[in-house]
Amino acid sequence: MQEGCVPWPEPTARAYREQGYWNADVLGTWPRTPGQDSAAALVTSAGTLTHAELDRAADRMAAGLLRAGLAAGDRIVVHLPNEAELIVLSLACFRTGVLPVYALPAHRSAEITHLVATAEAVAYVCPDQVLGCDFRLVAREVLDRTDSLRHVLVAGEPGPYTALSSLDADPVGLPAPDPEDVALFLLSGGTSGPPKLIPRTHADYAYQLRESARLCAVGEDDVYLAALPAQHNFALACPGVLGTLRAGGTAVLAPAPTADVCFPLIERAGVTVTSLVPPLVPLWLDAAEWTEHDLSSLRVLQVGGARLDPETARQVTKSLGGTLQQVYGMAEGLLNYTRLDDPEDVIVHTQGRPLSPADEVRVVREDGSDAEPGETGELLTRGPYTLRGYYRAPERNATRFTEDGHYRSGDLVRRTAQGDFQVVGRINDVVNRGGEKVPTQEVEEHLLAAVPVVAAAVIGLPDPHMGERTCACVVPRDPARPPTLRDVQAALRGRGVAAYKVPDRLVVLERLPLTGVGKVDKRALRAQLDA
């Protein structure tokens, strides 16, 4: 395994092989039936590639990577938007053993510098310009701050650097990757500091996307819309773009997740499956009330990244059609899905149950003892697609993993008697108001259900007498008629919320800051209020 990575213990790895969770399946080289060669594989703003064309493009870029001097084991930071180059380059990396480190669209020079330095990356791959940001200038800053970069590869006009399109050469014979070698690096959520690198092997990631596609009934007739950035684990492999391509289906990459962009794509491409984070769902529901686009092809709408409040969840099928599937997981591994045939009550009120029968999950109290069903505790997990350690992070690993290899998620959950999980929040995401602990996610759900807002976040602000007071930050449904603090307090009291949980302060915003993976960035929110 790659230096700096933590392997599974050999007895555990052997068991995963023997039980069939890990096999010879490697990313990017999947068998196809003859009819799939001419079927659409990838649809982007630049056009459509068939499965055969995508395969050839990946082979040519793989040869181009090798001709440019990159080799198996080299790390490259991939910072591309939802365009064909992202997927072609990913497949080329999987075939050559070059290891992509997936940066997120919102990242800029500080984050890219951190990723390059941590991975000792030899290349940075970026677009020329997106939404007014010139990423060639970002590259210049990163080059000035790091020592390992040898290549800057630009999709579009390269300026002083190298055009990504120049990585084009006649295909060459390539040795098959070892399924248990690292294939790619994902990023942690970054809610507690700079993102950490998550090594994923061919074997574990192939199992994840293969099993996710089976559970979601994704096959060659399906069309998956990557509304979210395809570097996200959610949009990439749950089953996402890679799971859909492996199944012989079609992946459509949206340049933005907004309804005005995605609804026409759903109609035009006949999209059957897509994925959203909770802040986007109310916006799609509002847009669905007036859209003239035909959304009837949509079979499954996955929602994950944070808990979806039940009131909003109930509206999804009524407004958008298809089946809502709640997904609770982490780039580190464990995935939980509601099943497509679950009762409505399970789909609305829970975030699903584990993907694999080999997922080992504990819910523990503060003292480390196992919680009872219905009792809140921290989720700990290990399994055939859950990492055993972050990349080059021994100090972090010492606190985030138990001695027997369970990953400490930091998530507070409840497990029902039927085995489904309900996400309560994060261990450190509580407000200590005069000694009373205010669970912020609970209050946020009350706000979304009882107040006319499309987004809500509750944070603690310092107070000389109480230690902290609660502040509700909201985005109003109608900007011309924002709620007042009195409105909010009355609405929550009307729902029977305890007095200490009712917000002390209200801040109305145009939008909430989000992390790269679509979660509310409460650190940025606090900094915004302090400014």
Predicted feature residues:
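Conserved AMP-binding/adenylation subdomain of ANL enzymes
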Residues: 206-223, 233-273, 287
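Conserved ATP/PPi-binding loop(s) of AMP-dependent carboxylate-activating enzymes
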Residues: 354-358, 367-400, 438
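Conserved beta-loop-beta connector loops within the AMP-binding
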Residues: 347, 362-380, 417-418, 479-486, ...
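Conserved pre-ATP/AMP-binding loop-to-beta segment of ANL
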Residues: 38, 169-189, 194, 199-203, ...
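Conserved AMP-binding/adenylate-forming core of the ANL superfamily
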Residues: 21-23, 38-83, 87-91, 108-113, ...
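Structural core segment of the AMP-binding/adenylate-forming
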Residues: 67-68, 98-164
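AMP-binding/adenylate-forming catalytic core of the ANL superfamily
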Residues: 107-114, 124-126, 274, 383, ...
